Amino acid sequence: DVLRLCLWTKTRGIRLIVDESFVDFSCGMPDNTLLKDGILEEYPHLAVVKSISKSYGVPGLRLGILASADRELAAWIKKDVSIWNINSIAEFYMQIFGKYEQSYVRACNRFMKERDRFMQELSRVPFLNVFPSQANYFMCEVKPPMKARSLTGLLLKNHSICLLYTSPSPPD
């Protein structure tokens, strides 16, 4: 589907930016990334961004990449977008990161199995409509008669789970 979108945007002269920050958690990993020379060269209007710190669970390191075959875009980014310096801890992390790649792949595979199990369990809750996910989170619709605001209160009171309620609808 994403490659079809790449083709569609290419034929219309539209730049496409794809965020792959959570792609490591999706089925088909690691082969389902767009971060491949052949794909980037075939679709020079494509820019792929990925937060390494999100995927690998090291948010304090603030590591990420942007890849594109569009040299003008790369030159513009180098010129006009401030680049953060990488501190010594992040630099060391990048040096040892390959050593643990197979362990990371195994952990992602375990995560995918657990995600499937967890979705089945969530789907058993009568007032939730759980949408399938390839990420490390689920989107759920709270169905009547339960109200989202009431659910957040129950989860906090009964299970010490704190959720942020952000609906613009009036409170129940």
Give the ranges of each region predicted by the language model.
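Conserved PLP-binding catalytic core of the aspartate aminotransferase-like
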Residues: 111-112, 116, 122-158
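Residue-level detector of structured alpha->beta connecting loops
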Residues: 13, 44, 126-127, 160
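Active-site pre-lysine segment of PLP-dependent enzymes
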Residues: 1-16, 22-55
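Conserved small/polar residues in nucleotide/adenosyl-binding loops
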Residues: 165-172
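PLP-dependent aminotransferase class I/II
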Residues: 45-124, 128-131
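Hydrophobic beta-strand scaffold residues
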Residues: 16, 162-163
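Short amphipathic alpha-helical segments and helix-helix/interface helices
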Residues: 2-7, 35-40, 74, 98, ...
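Hydrophobic residues at beta-strand termini and immediately following loops
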Residues: 49, 163-164
